[in-house]
């Protein structure tokens, strides 16, 4: 039997400047096929790339430890380095699939850092892609029904003109719709450091299994993959193989559209007059054709999420809420909250800052790194624990007075969202001062949470444009 695998499974760029590659192998057919395909491919290299197989034992089933050991035996037989990493501790009672995914990638990343590897590969297949598309289609259809109903109610209540509301909503919804249906990206960047590549996304699972049979290899079947309690399993069981080619084409088209839209969003941000300083973002009132740009609500939503410390971009329903508020052509100052941000619109433009609710305090122990409020990453290189929280009004006023800052024109609501660090020796608001009263050795970095952990290659165009606005790093 001849098993034809796509000739372009691996790109030349996949292994550029890569001396070590982490392969995530569970023992299932997909990841096992990945192992042998990569192994054979690397034989063609003049300078060999080292394979390190990592098996994540989620410790969710009794069989998982034995399964990890079976992968270890395979690797020993082929003289390949193998590492088992485990999900330790108490497991969540809900959202177990998404939690396991996050933990899995974090464990793979830590091992990559430990091994000095710059690339991780996983065995996601066309089946995974098709299932993801079907799941998102079903969810988006529900969102579309809600969108149409709310649009009708808004027009009935006279919130804004039928033409304006329908036009903006249709364009904006289309933007989010296409983003979701591009599904699993072939390449992403994990923690801004390690490349994550899924080279088998265009290959059917049955093709990979036929490949393994030809090589005389057996694999492990995870019983979880047949459990209808999980949404993905239900979708998998309802999908007919004849639909795969059509859905794969739709995913490809959606991916191309998402890339085009990402570039359009990047161009729009560059065309707008945007500034971010001292906890406040301001977009000067754009000319009318930019306001009518299909990506404008998406851009406003982007800055709202980034200023508010959110970890996810706005879902369709919230984007629709934003659209309805942005289309109110009022000359009066208006203010509303969204995604953890206060958004204020007036004649001069739009201003954003972190709303004061749910900003918690924290402590960073010596040698530790702490993510505060989804906006700041603090590394404590000193020998004392430091406290982190929002800047206090009294501390701000004292700082302004002692440093001859302009108190009269200060925007205290946004200034009070800035990071303040403190200990027994004093306090410091790093973005406002060039010295540290608390005498701590620290590194502070402003992050963009939706893209900091896992950045899809499809979003790179507009993320590159956003980065300079949030390029805040303090090292003392």
From Swiss-Prot:
Pfam families: ATP_bind_3 (PF01171). It comes from the Bacteria. InterPro entries: Rossmann-like_a/b/a_fold, TilS/TtcA_N, tRNA_Ile_lys_synt, tRNA_Ile_lys_synt_N. GO terms for biological process: tRNA modification. The keyword Nucleotide-binding applies. GO terms for cellular component: cytoplasm. Its EC number is 6.3.4.19. One of its GO terms (molecular function) is tRNA(Ile)-lysidine synthase activity. It catalyses: cytidine(34) in tRNA(Ile2) + L-lysine + ATP = lysidine(34) in tRNA(Ile2) + AMP + diphosphate + H(+). It is found in: Cytoplasm. ATP binds at residues 26-31. Belongs to the tRNA(Ile)-lysidine synthase family. HAMAP family: tRNA_Ile_lys_synt (MF_01161). The N-terminal region contains the highly conserved SGGXDS motif, predicted to be a P-loop motif involved in ATP binding. Ligates lysine onto the cytidine present at position 34 of the AUA codon-specific tRNA(Ile) that contains the anticodon CAU, in an ATP-dependent manner. Cytidine is converted to lysidine, thus changing the amino acid specificity of the tRNA from methionine to isoleucine. This is tRNA(Ile)-lysidine synthase. It comes from Bartonella quintana (strain Toulouse) (Rochalimaea quintana).
